[in-house]
From Swiss-Prot:
Binds 2 magnesium ions per tetramer. GO terms for biological process: phenylalanyl-tRNA aminoacylation. Its main location: cytoplasm. Belongs to the class-II aminoacyl-tRNA synthetase family. Phe-tRNA synthetase alpha subunit type 2 subfamily. Its cofactor is Mg(2+). NCBIfam families: pheS, PRK04172.1. This is Phenylalanine--tRNA ligase alpha subunit. GO terms for cellular component: cytoplasm. It comes from Pyrobaculum calidifontis (strain DSM 21063 / JCM 11548 / VA1). The gene is pheS. Its EC number is 6.1.1.20.
Length: 488
């Protein structure tokens, strides 16, 4: 009689007909992976038949799991409706209203005058359709094919190919018996003859240990360091500043009024801290305060200017450099993290990286600014770049900078302009002009490396990390040797 390890015996016992291995694993209260070694051993001993079958399955993405928990955007918008007996009215104040409208439009629902107005029966019909879609997302195994295709397009699910392992006993159950597994015998086992009742686990020294891919650096850190190299190669000097910043450098020195909407709590992370903080020089605070009171016509508060925030822009660092260096001809840049209360989605994050730079010198013009921006973009390997007029409180004229993403289309990744006199003169810069810009490096990396979701820049998925590092290596080889130089 053949002696088998207990787990293998249990598999043979339960597999008198073809059965999925994962089903047997559930019965035994173990994982399928833990049984694989015994399956291979059973096949080698001729007591098991093994058949591998392949099937396509659908799994929720991170976004899909979020929608199962919180609801689809269109579902949440419809549930916010105010209804009477005849009609339902939906105000478009929900933060996800634009995304919800895009999906509701496919059902013939369109807004008028900033609201959606539907008859009661149409509302209930549309809501029932969305509820069916919500249930299908939560139960993918029974979801109709057309909804699965829609979920794929919306990146709520992903298609995966699974390998299903089926096993069947190849020997009669009465020809095998379970035994205790032993990897070492004692002298007592040998003397008493008990070793005959044990299953002695064989050692196969020819088996190679499992191969693991070599670790690679994080592709996004490599990208940020490469941007530093490019900027230094273009004649810029790097400066650094604190993440925890006083409002003065983050807002006031940039001519943003103290009642500006960007300084509200829904756009800025305020930090409560009773300890010491670095105060700006008194003469700068007085000069900036005078400009605010003269131009914006309100009573400027030095106490508010000393409140602490997590910096919302790295311009706080370049404006510090401008205040320290004053007049002259120089170029500086900084790369750092900034923080804003954004809702996390494929294009937005509450924490991201900015490249901020300034060029200081007499006689600089808007043409110089656009030329400098285009030169940096080309040095980083961007294809098509375009500019659109924009408004920022501290620059004039101003532009937004766009680049073409392979799948997302034109993506805005930065703003730029010439610092207004209200910014430069209180800092003592009266004869030079200052070209300034801030770029979102997370979006730049997405454009250059073909990444569709900003959250993937910080993914823990090892397969994705290796894939993106391979893209980074290809990008660096193709762009990193151009050696573009630019002088201004």
């Amino acid at each position: 009689m053949l002696v088998l390890p207990p787990p293998l015996y249990e598999i043979v016992k339960r597999a008198q007909e073809w059965r999925p291995l994962d089903e047997i694993a559930r019965e035994l209260g173990v994982t399928q992976e833990s049984l694989m070694r015994y399956v291979e051993e059973g096949r080698a001993k001729g007591v098991l038949q093994v058949d591998k079958r392949y099937a396509v399955a659908y799994e929720l993405t991170e976004e899909g799991a979020l929608r199962v928990r919180e609801g689809l955007p269109e579902y949440k918008l419809l549930k916010a409706a105010v209804c009477d007996e005849a009609r339902c009215v939906i105000e478009l104040k929900h933060p996800e209203a634009p995304l919800a409208l895009a999906n509701l439009a496919k059902l013939g629902v369109k807004p008028r005058g900033g609201v959606i107005e539907l008859s009661r029966d149409v509302y209930e019909r549309v809501l029932a359709s969305i509820e069916e879609k919500q249930r299908a997302l939560a139960q993918l195994d029974s979801a109709p094919p057309d909804l699965l295709q829609e979920f794929l397009r919306r990146k709520l699910v992903k298609k995966v190919e699974k390998t299903l392992i089926y096993v069947k006993a190849a020997a009669p159950l009465d020809s095998v018996k379970p035994a205790e597994v032993k990897t070492a015998l004692t002298s007592e086992d040998i003397a008493t003859g008990r070793w005959r009742e044990y299953y002695l686990k064989p050692f196969d020294l020819s088996i190679e240990p499992p191969q693991y891919p070599a670790p690679v650096p994080h592709f996004f850190n490599e990208f940020l360091n490469y941007v530093r190299e490019v900027m230094v190669g273009l004649g810029f000097e790097e400066v650094r500043g604190p993440i925890l910043e006083v409002e003065f450098w983050n807002f006031d020195a940039l001519f943003q009024a103290q009642d500006h909407p960007a300084r509200e709590v829904h756009d800025t992370f305020y930090v409560h801290w009773d300890g010491p903080r670095e105060e700006p020089p008194r003469h700068l605070m007085e000069a900036v305060g005078r400009v605010h009171e003269e131009k914006w016509r309100y009573k400027w508060s030095p106490q508010k200017a000393l409140n602490l925030v997590l910096r919302t822009q790295t311009t706080a660092t370049t404006i510090r450099a401008l205040a320290e260096r004053g007049e002259g001809a120089y170029k500086v840049f900084t790369i750092g993290r900034v923080f804003r209360p954004e809702k996390l989605d494929p294009k937005h994050s509450m924490e991201f990286h900015q490249l901020d730079g300034i060029v200081v010198g007499p006689g600089l013009t808007f043409k110089h600014l656009l030329g400098q921006l285009e030169q940096i973009a080309k040095a980083l390997g961007m294809g098509r770049v375009k500019f659109r007029p924009a408004y920022f409180p501290f620059t004039s004229p101003s532009v937004e900078v766009y680049a073409e993403h392979p799948t997302l289309g034109w993506v805005e990744f930065g703003g730029a302009g010439i610092f207004r006199p209200e910014v430069t003169e209180p800092l003592g810069v009266k004869n030079s002009r200052v070209l300034a810009w801030g770029w979102g490096l997370d979006r730049v990396a997405m454009i250059l490396l073909g990444i569709d979701d900003i959250r993937d820049l910080f993914t823990k998925d090892l397969d994705k990390l290796r894939e993106y590092y391979a893209r980074w290596e290809k990008y660096r080889r193709g762009v990193g040797t151009r050696g573009i130089k630019y002088t201004l």
